[in-house]
Amino acid sequence: MSNTKTASTGFAELLKDRREQVKMDHAALASLLGETPETVAAWENGEGGELTLTQLGRIAHVLGTSIGALTPPAGNDLDDGVIIQMPDERPILKGVRDNVDYYVYNCLVRTKRAPSLVPLVVDVLTDNPDDAKFNSGHAGNEFLFVLEGEIHMKWGDKENPKEALLPTGASMFVEEHVPHAFTAAKGTGSAKLIAVNF
């Protein structure tokens, strides 16, 4: 999904401030995140590579805050209130689960004015619901709309999930931190949906 550079001075300072505010040292935060203290220190120094939206959400959750509170204030990237993304500017990312191409994310236009809004067109490449790979539930609510094909949706308890078959035109709302997974319906090949995280 969307990547945010940890080199941002704003993120580094906000992370350090929040960690200190909740009285955690590097080791305590690292332990809760499954990272090393050196990694946390690197993030606070504006180093450490890139973090995904999911990783930022996990850090925010552990620190009892929001992704927005850990990111610098938005600048204005709009032109008289509008931003346009042309087709050749659209990032395309592969979602891989257990070394299998699972999704292709076509990242739609984003703006600094609404940094938590992440709109995607998702090509769902697997059609075996038995192989559905649950996420752990992410920060931010999610809206889904099925554009093509049928989606087999699972959510909640991974061992005893709730399930629904969503035909073209169906939509669904998923509350933040609810584990979920979706595949194309069994034997249908693939499907396509719009997903908006906010």
Curated annotation (Swiss-Prot):
Fe cation binds at H138, E142, H180. InterPro entries: Bact_TransReg_Diox, Cro/C1-type_HTH, Cupin_2, Lambda_DNA-bd_dom_sf, RmlC-like_jellyroll, RmlC_Cupin_sf. It comes from the Bacteria. It catalyses: (S)-2-hydroxypropylphosphonate + H2O2 = (1R,2S)-epoxypropylphosphonate + 2 H2O. Gene3D superfamilies: Jelly Rolls (2.60.120.10), lambda repressor-like DNA-binding domains (1.10.260.40). Keywords: Antibiotic biosynthesis, Dioxygenase, DNA-binding, Iron, Metal-binding, NAD, Oxidoreductase. GO terms for molecular function: dioxygenase activity; DNA binding; DNA-binding transcription factor activity; ferrous iron binding; oxidoreductase activity, acting on paired donors, with oxidation of a pair of donors resulting in the reduction of molecular oxygen to two molecules of water. Signal peptide: none annotated. GO terms for cellular component: cytosol. One of its GO terms (biological process) is antibiotic biosynthetic process. Residues 26-45 bind DNA. Its cofactor is Fe(2+). Binds 1 Fe(2+) ion per subunit. Changing E142A: Abolishes (S)-2-hydroxypropylphosphonic acid epoxidase activity. Non-heme-dependent dioxygenase that catalyzes the oxidative epoxidation of (S)-2-hydroxypropylphosphonate into (1R,2S)-epoxypropylphosphonate, the final step in the biosynthesis of fosfomycin antibiotic. Homotetramer. Belongs to the non-heme iron-dependent dioxygenase family. Phosphinothricin tripeptide (PTT) herbicide and fosfomycin antibiotic biosynthesis pathways share early steps starting with phosphoenolpyruvate before the pathways diverge after formation of 2-hydroxyethylphosphonate (HEP). HppE is involved in fosfomycin biosynthesis after divergence of the 2 pathways. This is (S)-2-hydroxypropylphosphonic acid epoxidase. The gene is hppE.
